[in-house]
Design a protein with these regions (language model features):
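N-terminal amphipathic/basic-hydrophobic helices that include classical n-h-c signal peptides
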Residues: 1-25
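N-terminal alpha/beta PP-like core and its mobile active-site loop of ThDP/TPP-dependent enzymes
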Residues: 21-357, 479-482, 517-518
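Active-site diphosphate/adenylate-binding microenvironment
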Residues: 34-37, 44, 52-55, 60-65, ...
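Thiamine diphosphate
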Residues: 133, 137-142, 287-290, 333-335, ...
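Short hydrophobic beta-strand segments
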Residues: 48-49, 234-236, 401-405, 460
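Phosphate/pyrophosphate-binding active-site segments
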Residues: 25-28, 165, 203, 319-406, ...
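Basic phosphate/pyrophosphate-binding loop/patch that engages nucleotide-derived ligands
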Residues: 180, 397-398, 474-479
Length: 568
């Protein structure tokens, strides 16, 4: 592969842009399609892009230095994708990647898969071979037989831009997905002869935005009647309801209705609210409140295994009437069968529903929630030491954004961690279930929310997937805390092998000295062996301008019974 050009974009605001435009007029230089793309992205409200420049994408970078877009250079395209994911989850706005063709795109497919599984808006812009070379198989640099077909498996749609004139409407299609459909990655590839073509004539005029769908009037009326008649209603909210937090609270309080959340909906109700069940529908006590309900209203959830059957207890089958609301009509026909299926955005539905309801109901909501919460400490998979650990994090850094990987503490966080607000907790253990997510995703979240403390929680095995991205964080001046939960290899997999009567193989991996490695990458680092030393390290991390790695040995903080976290 040819050497990549390492460019650093400097965001110097409108003044820099004005100077650049003046020079262009004086020289009479054309504006390439790559430059015009940057201008259009800025007009769409994009302020950050993640990518590694390469020979096939230099035209995207021609316009960056004079724009209002900040460019962040990861150390691997997988890091770019996970940074974009973290940025998007923290804000609700699409994270944007610039990728070279071939290996640049394939390196980002895992983040795209994770984002697709969790409905995270992401715009992936890549190069591709020139139009006359597409599908020829002649051995051109970075060539794939059908790059778009590969990307289409991990995106809402993948499009090859055949003419510069199509750029505004193709971008409009992408943002229509983000604004009005179930979000996820959108991939746009630009052939090399198109990205360099003249786009000077294209106006920076956005297409009208597309509003999300609202419910049919008859469906809203029927839902209101069913909810009004119920005496033990329960609401289940997924990631599709996060943007409707105010409406969720209003409806829950009007109907005196307990609210059960999935991982992606943590924090939608304020923690400690009398109607917030918290925990997880994978836990027995929470399942019971659903089974005891005489009506369930489900908003923006797929009823997927990693939220509703993480402990492999068997499928949850609701026997009561079920109202399902989803922005994706296909989801209404998956997993749980609804009594009433409503194709609508959750917020639009709740706003239509509220005036149809009568006066405040009395359905013993707080009492039912208290019963669930009282039962949680007796659950086989509840761990008091993890509860102490999570409470320490929140006390040290109030309002933190906690970004988890597929690692032991995040599994317990599914049912024991309560986020302070929407978009303040997310992890990769659901959906795609990838490793190496937390470090780059936390960097993306911090870039999106610079005034909020951000903590990555990752295992010693997972950390080795993307540890190099700490160098990108140090270069960008991103002050996150990274807790490396060290349990000496792939501990959960080892326990699973032992439980299945398999001699463990491939799980006892050697780890570097994480403290020294972090310092070598330009970060700060410490080891925490007690709750107080962890608290101090977290506080110290907030006064720096680089990531702080905090290594924690599992045995210093918790003890586990033999057999693995998911075994009784």
């Amino acid at each position: 592969m040819l050497a990549r050009h390492h460019l650093r974009a400097r965001n110097q605001g409108p003044v820099r842009q004005t100077v650049t435009e003046t020079i262009m007029v004086e020289k009479g230089a054309m504006v390439t399609c790559g430059e015009k793309l940057v201008q259009l992205l800025e007009s769409h409200g994009v302020d950050t892009v993640f990518g590694i420049p390469g020979n096939h994408t230099v035209e995207l970078y021609r316009g960056l230095a004079g724009s209002g877009l900040r460019h962040v250079s990861p150390r691997h395209e997988q890091g770019a994708g996970f940074m974009a994911d973290g940025y998007a989850r923290a804000t609700g706005r699409p994270g944007v990647c610039f990728l070279i063709s071939g290996p640049g795109l394939t390196n980002a497919l895992t983040p795209m898969m994770q984002a697709l599984a969790d409905s995270v808006p992401m715009l992936v812009i890549s190069a591709v071979a020139a139009r006359h070379q597409l599908g020829m198989g002649e051995g051109h640099l970075h060539e794939l037989p059908d790059q778009r077909a590969l990307a289409s498996q991990c995106s809402r749609f993948s499009h090859t831009l055949m003419r510069a004139d199509e750029l505004p409407k193709v971008l409009a299609r992408a943002f229509a997905v983000f604004d009005s459909e179930r979000p996820g990655p959108v991939h746009i590839e630009i052939p090399l002869d198109v990205i360099t073509s003249d786009a000077s004539h294209l106006e920076i005029e956005l297409w009208p935005s597309v509003a999300p769908p609202g419910p049919a009037i008859a469906a809203a009326d029927e839902a209101a009647a069913m909810l009004t008649a119920a005496s033990r209603p329960v609401m289940v909210i997924g990631g599709g309801a996060v943007s409707a937090a105010d409406e969720v609270l209003q409806i829950a309080e009007r109907l005196d209705m307990p609210v059960v959340n999935t991982v992606n909906a943590k924090g939608t109700l304020p923690p400690g609210h009398a109607l917030a069940v918290g925990s997880s529908p994978s836990i027995g006590a929470v399942r019971q409140i659903l089974l005891d309900a005489d009506l369930v209203l489900a908003l923006g959830t797929e009823f997927g295994e990693t939220d509703f059957d993480m402990l492999f207890a068997g499928d949850l089958v609701l026997s009561c009437p079920l109202i399902r609301v989803d922005i994706d009509a296909r989801q209404l026909c998956r997993n749980q069968r609804p009594t009433l299926a409503i194709h609508a955005d959750s917020g639009e539905f709740l706003r239509r529903l509220l005036p149809l309801l009568g006066p405040a109901a009395t359905n013993d909501g707080p009492a039912r929630v208290r019963a669930v919460r009282a039962a949680l400490p007796d659950e086989a998979h509840y761990h008091s030491q993890f509860q102490d650990f999570f409470e320490l994090l929140q006390a040290a850094l109030p309002g933190l954004v906690l970004v988890g990987d597929s690692t032991l503490p995040t599994y317990y966080a599914v049912w024991q961690y309560e986020a302070s607000a929407p978009r303040r907790y997310f992890h990769s253990a659901t959906g795609g279930g990838t490793l190496g997510y937390a470090i780059p995703a936390a960097l993306g979240a911090k870039l999106a929310l610079p005034d909020s403390p951000v903590v990555a929680l990752i295992g010693d095995g997972s950390a080795q997937f993307t540890f190099a991205e700490l160098a990108a964080g140090a270069a960008a001046g991103v002050a996150i805390a990274v807790i490396i939960w060290n349990n000496a290899g792939y501990s959960e997999i080892e326990q699973g092998m032992l439980a299945a009567g398999i001699t463990p193989v491939g799980v006892d991996i050697a780890a570097p000295d994480f403290v020294e490695a972090a310092i070598a990458l330009g970060c700060a680092a410490a080891r925490a062996t007690t709750p107080e030393s962890l608290r101090r390290a977290l506080l110290d991390s907030q006064s720096r301008h680089v990531p702080t790695v905090i290594e924690v040995m599992q045995t210093d903080f918790i003890s586990l019974p033999a057999g693995g976290w998911y075994r009784d």
